[in-house]
Curated annotation (Swiss-Prot):
Organism taxonomic ancestry: Bacteria, Thermotogati, Deinococcota, Deinococci, Thermales
Residue numbers spanned by region N-acetyltransferase: 247-453
Catalytic activity: alpha-D-glucosamine 1-phosphate + acetyl-CoA = N-acetyl-alpha-D-glucosamine 1-phosphate + CoA + H(+); N-acetyl-alpha-D-glucosamine 1-phosphate + UTP + H(+) = UDP-N-acetyl-alpha-D-glucosamine + diphosphate
Superkingdom to which the source organism belongs: Bacteria
Region (Pyrophosphorylase): 1-225
Cofactor: Mg(2+)
Name the record gives this protein: Bifunctional protein GlmU
The encoding gene: glmU
Entry's Gene Ontology molecular function annotations: glucosamine-1-phosphate N-acetyltransferase activity; magnesium ion binding; UDP-N-acetylglucosamine diphosphorylase activity
Native organism: Thermus thermophilus (strain ATCC 27634 / DSM 579 / HB8)
Pfam families named among the record's database cross-references: Hexapep (PF00132), NTP_transf_3 (PF12804)
Protein localization: Cytoplasm
Role summary: Catalyzes the last two sequential reactions in the de novo biosynthetic pathway for UDP-N-acetylglucosamine (UDP-GlcNAc). The C-terminal domain catalyzes the transfer of acetyl group from acetyl coenzyme A to glucosamine-1-phosphate (GlcN-1-P) to produce N-acetylglucosamine-1-phosphate (GlcNAc-1-P), which is converted into UDP-GlcNAc by the transfer of uridine 5-monophosphate (from uridine 5-triphosphate), a reaction catalyzed by the N-terminal domain.
Length: 453
């Protein structure tokens, strides 16, 4: 049994953004949720998030999670922020885990190691990391596992600055925590209350303070846009490695972007520059071409999305293909062996087995029957200025190039629509519909007009 407090009240001025720092996205979800999910993995008895700057937005992001919220009205430092949780946890005996909402790489395994030290008798345990360049971090002084102190860089003599072990900002405490917090002073230039001051307070009360050295990568926090990009890069490398280990082929993996919510099957091939977002699910043997973007899209086994295609909320069945340069909007469903080619846009439409729309077409709010061919430049005119209307095209129909089907309208099975037609009435099964002005040839007109006759 333990309680976990996540500190998420900071303003994040160096981000230069109106969005609260902890809500900046990493691979499609707010940074704070990474810290929250790591905390939940250990099944805490109580989970408190301390919010402050932009707190209303932060609380919205926490909706649906089993958390309690404490408010830090004034941002007076990390120790002051933690003290705001006392009202919720006053009767909780401990131990307590404390992490930061802007440190999203911490693993449950590392947090468990901190908690174990306190359960084994330490009063306080803190996570440390050895950094190649510790500039800007407080240095850890210790003997063995015992922490003697934390020296801020500005106060450190040269021999202390040479130390590369730093405080990573994650802690475990025993039940003495809130009493100790009340002894923290703000005798510093910023007039703020800092968590590292608890090291000296715990030691003064005869309680052991131990260090747990973690992986340097996990200690990475986010205070700037550059650091945000660095952390996102770490998350991406982990995710790519995980999927390649499960049988996904990535060509130039460092160029591929994907989010944790994406699901991939073995023998999927991802070409350079592919972007996979949201609840995208890609089946076995599928291929995603260079610079294709898939969001909330399903590719069933054997489907292909070719270069520079954008698909949002689409569903491609086995053997279907789209692209290059196609656009599939929400509700686009391509059944088996459908092909949608270059510069074809499909929105809220069902294309049955074997439909071909090779180039330069718009199919919106339509249902197209099995085996039908859609010529170049075909448009389903679905919007009358007030409402959307449906176009229905039967099986094995042929819609000639540059035709416009003005919805609501139906073209029957095996019907033909002549090129360049504007269809405003239903076309019966097996009929030919031609709706265009008859061609006239005026002999000699051009020569006379140009004065060369």
């Amino acid at each position: 049994m333990h309680a976990h407090v996540i500190l998420a009240a900071g303003q994040g001025t160096r981000m230069r953004s109106r969005l609260p720092k902890v809500l900046h996205p990493l691979l499609g979800k707010p940074m704070l949720l990474y810290a929250l999910e790591a905390a939940l993995a250990l099944k805490p008895e109580r989970l408190v998030v301390v919010v402050g700057h932009g707190g209303e937005k932060v609380v919205e992001a926490l909706e649906g999670y089993p958390v309690e919220v404490a408010w830090q009205k004034e941002q007076l430092g990390t120790a002051h922020a933690l003290l705001q949780a006392e009202g919720l946890l006053r009767d909780f005996p401990g131990p307590f885990l404390v992490t930061q909402g802007d440190t999203p790489l911490l693993s449950p395994r590392t947090l468990e190691a901190l908690l174990r030290r306190v359960r084994e008798g330490a009063g306080m345990a803190l996570l440390t990391a050895e950094l190649p360049d510790p500039t800007g971090y407080g240095r850890i002084l210790r003997e063995g596992e015992e922490v003697l102190g934390n020296v801020e860089e500005k106060d450190a003599p040269p021999e202390v600055r040479a130390i590369r072990e730093v405080n990573a900002g994650a802690y475990a405490f025993d039940g003495f925590l809130f009493q100790a917090l009340k002894e923290v002073r703000n005798e510093n230039a910023a007039r703020e209350y800092y968590l590292p001051d608890l090291i000296a307070i715990y030691r003064a009360h005869g309680r052991r303070v131990l260090a747990v050295r973690g992986v340097a990568e996990e200690a990475l926090g986010v205070n700037t846009r550059e650091e945000l990009a660095r952390v996102e890069g770490v998350l991406l490398r982990r995710l790519r490695a995980e999927w390649m280990g499960k049988g996904v082929r990535m060509i130039l993996p460092e160029t591929i972007y994907l989010e944790p919510s994406v699901e991939l099957a073995p023998d999927v091939t991802l070409w350079p520059g592919a972007v996979l977002k949201g609840k995208t699910r890609i089946g076995e043997g599928c291929e995603v071409g260079p610079y294709a973007v898939l969001e909330d899209t399903v590719l069933e086994p054997g489907a292909k999305v070719l270069a520079h295609t954008v698909a949002q909320g689409a569903h491609l069945h086995p053997g279907a293909s789209a692209g290059p340069f196609a656009r599939l909007r929400p509700g686009a469903v391509l059944m088996e062996e459908v092909h949608v080619g270059n510069f074809v846009e499909v929105k809220n439409s069902l294309l049955h087995k074997g439909v071909k729309a090779g180039h330069l077409a718009y199919l919106g709010d339509a249902e197209v029957g099995e085996g039908t061919n859609i010529g170049a430049g075909v448009i389903t005119a679905n919007y009358d200025g007030k409402r959307k209307h449906k176009t229905e095209i039967g099986k094995k129909a042929f819609i000639g190039s540059n035709s416009v089907l003005v919805a609501p309208v139906r073209v029957g099975d095996r019907a033909l629509v002549g090129a360049g037609s504007v269809i405003t009435q239903d076309v019966p099964e097996g009929a030919l519909a031609v709706a265009r002005e008859r061609q006239k040839n005026l002999e000699g007109y051009a020569l006379r007009k140009l004065g060369e006759g």
